[in-house]
Amino acid sequence: LLRLIDLLCEGPNRLFGIVGKGRLVVGYDADVTLVDLAASREITDDWVAAKCGWTPFAGMTVTGWPVGTIIRGRSVMRDGQLMNEPSGQVMRFYEGAGP
């Protein structure tokens, strides 16, 4: 789990220098996905919320399923249901960060 956190959260922040992302500490955005590690589900296109409406992973069965998402401290998904309209924000980067 610690390796996964590094790959998905801390690593991109180190690599790209994204301001306020990658950690759960005071002053950072509270971006969290809650995952039920015991849940097993088949991925289907009808679950995809992206504009394209499909995924190349359709038909695959996976163990571990997102059950909630919090973005900037606001709950946006619970039990597979989107709770609010999308509300994107411009991302900021530390000067001189990146590859």
Which stretches of residues belong to each language-model region?
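Active-site microenvironment of metallo-dependent hydrolases
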Residues: L1-P99
